[in-house]
């Protein structure tokens, strides 16, 4: 079974320099995987009186994404029905959201979250910002392709019709996924020049030359920008984040802050987002679910360690305190353990 799957994977990845599943993911491929058996067990769980949610959660959260795609295929072949719609009828609430999210490929998931953030009245800017600011070039290019496939329109077109001004310019530039890749050569002259340009375009003058900020922050590689933000402190009395707070407001401020934090330390950025989703009264489940689903195979172990370091208690502990039932169980499986 796996060999056929491996061949299919290789074929679909040709010309796509895909990184191997991350060593820092909390969800790994299940060793004794059998798509047919999983599909059958899910089918039985759905038909059980009152729905056997535990079995569904156990299977879906303990398989990696490629394996879930095999289960979707096997289920369809077995029952002539789509697994997603069967589970949609069987489950409800936040648990349904988690499980349906896990059945999509990463790009389908991001594309559907982006579409949802721009649908109907008003835009959910926070979701738009989080996804667009935190994905790699390769991820963004795949999202653009899948978005067009799913919605018969370009992601860029939807962003343009849903946003305005400099915020729109920043989102459009980021969504292209054309940031320079990490070079092996460190260009100290350019680092210094960029740091000075960011200062000259903002804190140093009256008003802000936002296009200058956008071009540097969306075109340069991440390691380069990390050094630029360090160098920036030798020109400006404020660090980059403080400068943003002083210079711009609203969605644009929010977007630049997210972008800089994610450039400085991506796992810490997600740890902060997770903490914010659970602190105080009530839970921002949409954010919690999206990060747990989308980072579980990427960098969840790094996120967990940043979370514990900064907030003193584990992410696992926070999820336990903040959620309940099978929804909680699903999130804890994705978290992958206590620290």
Swiss-Prot record:
PROSITE patterns: ANNEXIN_1, ANNEXIN_2. It is found in: Secreted, Extracellular space, Extracellular matrix, Basement membrane; Melanosome. Keywords: Acetylation, Annexin, Basement membrane, Calcium, Calcium/phospholipid-binding, Extracellular matrix, Phosphoprotein, Repeat, Secreted. The keyword Acetylation applies. The modification N-acetylserine is found at residue 2. GO terms for molecular function: calcium ion binding; calcium-dependent phospholipid binding; cytoskeletal protein binding; phosphatidylserine binding; phospholipase inhibitor activity. InterPro entries: Annexin, Annexin_repeat, Annexin_repeat_CS, Annexin_sf, ANX2. Residues 2-24 are annotated as: S100A10-binding site. One of its GO terms (biological process) is positive regulation of receptor-mediated endocytosis involved in cholesterol transport. The keyword Phosphoprotein applies. GO terms for cellular component: basement membrane; cytoplasm; extracellular exosome; melanosome; nucleus; plasma membrane; vesicle membrane. The modification N6-acetyllysine is found at residues 49, 152, 227. Annexin repeats lie at residues 33-104, 105-176, 189-261, 265-336. SUPFAM superfamilies: Annexin. It comes from the Eukaryota. Its main location: secreted. Belongs to the annexin family. A pair of annexin repeats may form one binding site for calcium and phospholipid. Heterotetramer containing 2 light chains of S100A10/p11 and 2 heavy chains of ANXA2P2/p36. It may cross-link plasma membrane phospholipids with actin and the cytoskeleton and be involved with exocytosis. Calcium-regulated membrane-binding protein whose affinity for calcium is greatly enhanced by anionic phospholipids. It binds two calcium ions with high affinity. May be involved in heat-stress response. This is Putative annexin A2-like protein. The gene is ANXA2P2.
